[in-house]
Amino acid sequence: VATGLGVRLEKPVKVIDKVLYRADGAGYLPPGYAHLFVVSSEGGAARQVTRGDHDFNAPAAWLPDSRSVIVAANLDADADYKPLETELYRIDIETGATIRLTQRSGPDRAPAVSPDGRHVAYVGFDDRKLGYQNSQLSILDLASGTSRVLSAALDRSAEAPELDGNEAIVFEYEDRGSTTVARVAATGGAIRILATDLG
């Protein structure tokens, strides 16, 4: 590439116009955004569901009617300046219409939907601008829009929630370098350890 200054560059100049352009362990991030696509179980072409200059973060959780999914995203205009901030959104698969389900300062992510489609388990925290904050396990009632924290008594970061029927949530947390799997009722209460020392 000729520079006009009598110097020839081996590689083209990289123009960066985004706040988030590089990540530890990944290097320069490719341009573009992460979006949801669907493919028929019969096969065929993928169809894009979400659009715009925002990332829609995996995993997405299907509702039982297969008409919508719940996913974490930051759809604010200044999303690049709030890298931790995500909310849960319900997205209509046919229209791409979004409905915000959570709203707080801090990340909400990793949704898991109950088999009856009435509740969503997820993890996140109220961002107090600290160096590290534990992710709390919460459950959202889709009809009322209210959320309740289920792991407030646990001084560990809850991750990977999965519904155990409609009555309980199974999740994991790291404890002294080892993974523990635990279970808590959807209505709250004591956390019961299911397995420890999982690596």
Where are these regions (language model features)?
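Structured loop/turn residues at beta-strand edges in well-structured enzyme cores
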Residues: 31, 44, 64, 115, ...
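A flexible loop/linker signature enriched in serine peptidases of the S9 family
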Residues: 1-35, 50-57, 72-87, 100-112, ...
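Catalytic core of nucleotide-activated saccharide and alditol-phosphate transferases
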Residues: 193
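Short loop/turn segments that connect beta-strands within beta-propeller blades
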Residues: 40-44, 92-96, 141-145, 185-189
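Blade-terminus and WD-like Trp-Asp/Gly-His loop motifs, strongest in beta-propeller folds
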Residues: 60-68, 111-119, 161-168
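A short helix->beta-strand "capping" segment at the edge of beta-propeller domains
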Residues: 44-50
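Hydrophobic "anchor" residues
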Residues: 46, 68, 98, 119-120, ...
